[in-house]
A protein has these predicted regions:
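Sec-dependent signal peptide recognition
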Residues: 1-7
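Hydrophobic h-region of N-terminal signal peptides that target proteins for export
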Residues: 9-16
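Catalytic cores of carbohydrate-active enzymes
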Residues: 20-31, 41-47, 166-178, 213-289, ...
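Active-site acid/base region of carbohydrate-active enzymes
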Residues: 21-40, 44, 94-103, 142-206, ...
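Active-site core of glycosidic bond-cleaving carbohydrate-active enzymes
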Residues: 25-30, 56-96, 156-159, 206-225, ...
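The feature captures the catalytic groove of carbohydrate-active enzymes
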Residues: 56-59, 63, 102-133, 139-143, ...
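The substrate-binding groove and active-site-proximal loops of carbohydrate-active enzymes
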Residues: 71, 77, 117-124, 142-152
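Terminal, non-catalytic domain-edge segments
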Residues: 399-431
């Protein structure tokens, strides 16, 4: 029966549905109506150490996070010029933390309004240094606001944050970047990384290298717009160097796959995880190779494609599961996550898979709408095979009530707007 379904599912996905743009408009309308009630939960007024209004995932999470805030703020900026201020303020709140902490550019990836972070590693998280999204957020906000000058007072903060990452997460031998732990990556238990305290800083990571490449390009853009020509050239050269190193060391042509690589041996970590596909949002591969990677793995039910979105780990992997968990790790070993599905959506669009991108937007739209109708909010991840919301649950919450989740799930609206309105111009910033 499984084989029969897999064959049917593959054939169905091979043919884009007719009148996709027209058919997604009612779904967009319903999702937009539901999100109008949930979106305000992600915005908190300035307080404590935060000089500006700040962004939170809402529900289970009350803190300001790095990539959560980036995705939420990007969504808000996509919706209107007025709301781009929240992405701007997210950047400035993190930049302000760099000044307040005063630790040579170190800023953690999560901040609290009422408690200054202690500059020392934790047993589980390690140093948990902020991910490379701040400059990208600054560019998206600046483009939407039509104003780059607000970045000038925070420019040196951004420079120090980038320099800290170069000192602590860059391997000059390989000319590539590594995560300290899987937790730092945001994909808490990603099997292509490790949380072993005896094996920290061990794995050169394709997703981090891609994010850092884009961060370099964003820094170059900011420098150019601020009239800093020498610094603009510096960051563009670093981006070009990093791209070349990724192709040399992380791309395995015989497998048509990017793999993480161990720093000590140079051996690939041959696990097909969702993070392997992040480079497809950038022009790193020749187009033909990128399309091969998508056809063979990303849009293939035997690997990444599931009935309810794109999995976080290949179905063929021995660790594949859809267990509901949130503490100490959320589950990135199978469930569907909206933020990474948004990246896959961008990759599909970039590589010319228009019908597949529209189908993915529709699948995710129906997924979150069903969740909202049942629970009044959403979950942070979903069972890839059944569409069931996984975490957080009432049992995982301190007060034993369903807390919900909003956060980056708002990006479903952006994907549907791109398809239903045939306007994707704001989903990526100018390179």
């Amino acid at each position: 029966m499984r084989l029969t379904f897999a064959v049917f599912f593959t054939v169905w996905l091979a043919f884009p549905q007719a009148n996709t743009t027209e058919s997604l408009q009612p779904l967009l309308d319903d999702v937009s109506s539901a999100y109008a009630k949930l979106e305000p939960q992600t915005i908190r007024p300035a307080e404590g150490y935060f000089k500006y209004d700040y962004l939170i995932p809402a529900g289970f999470y009350k803190q300001m996070w790095d990539w959560d805030g980036f995705f939420i703020g990007s969504h808000l900026a996509h919706q209107s010029r007025e709301q781009a201020k929240y992405l701007k303020w997210w950047v400035l709140n993190f930049a302000g933390a760099e000044t307040t902490i005063n630790k040579d550019g170190w800023v953690p990836g999560v901040l609290l309004a009422d408690k200054l972070p202690v500059p020392k590693p934790s047993p589980i998280l390690g140093w948990f240094t902020v991910k490379p999204f701040l400059a990208q957020g600054a560019v998206i906000a600046s483009e939407r606001l039509r104003d780059y000058q607000w970045v000038a007072p925070a420019w040196e903060n951004l420079r120090r944050i980038v320099a800290y990452r170069e000192r602590t997460q860059y391997d000059p031998k390989w000319e590539l970047f590594f995560w300290e732990t899987a937790m730092q990556s945001g994909e808490d238990n990603n099997v292509a990384l490790t949380n072993d305290p005896k094996d920290r800083n061990a794995i050169l990571a394709v997703d981090l290298c891609t994010f850092q490449l884009r961060e370099y390009k964003a820094m170059a853009r900011l420098a150019e717009m601020l009239g800093k020509k020498t610094e603009a050239r510096e960051y563009q050269q670093k981006a070009d160097k990093l791209r070349a190193a990724m192709l040399k060391h992380l791309w395995f042509a015989q497998d048509a796959m990017f793999f993480n690589v161990r720093r000590d041996t140079g051996e690939p970590v041959q696990r097909i995880s969702g993070s392997n596909f992040v480079p497809l949002i950038e022009d790193i591969l020749p187009p033909a190779d990128a399309r091969t990677m998508i056809r063979r793995y990303l849009w293939n039910p035997e690997y990444m494609l599931a009935p309810f979105g794109i999995r976080s780990l290949s179905k063929r992997d021995s660790s594949y599961n859809n267990v509901s968990m949130i503490d100490p790790y959320s589950n990135w070993q199978g469930p569907v996550w909206i933020n990474t599905n948004y990246l896959y959506f961008l990759a599909l669009k970039r590589c010319g898979f228009e019908g597949e991108a529209a189908q993915l937007a529709g699948i995710l739209g129906r997924l979150v709408l069903a969740d909202i109708h049942k629970w009044g909010s959403m979950h942070e991840c979903y069972h890839a095979e059944t569409g069931e919301g996984l975490a957080p649950t009432a049992e995982q919450s301190k007060d034993h009530a369903f807390p919900g989740f909003v956060g980056w799930n708002l990006l479903v609206q952006d994907m549907l707007q791109c398809e239903a309105k045939a306007d994707c111009s704001r989903l990526d910033w100018p390179m």
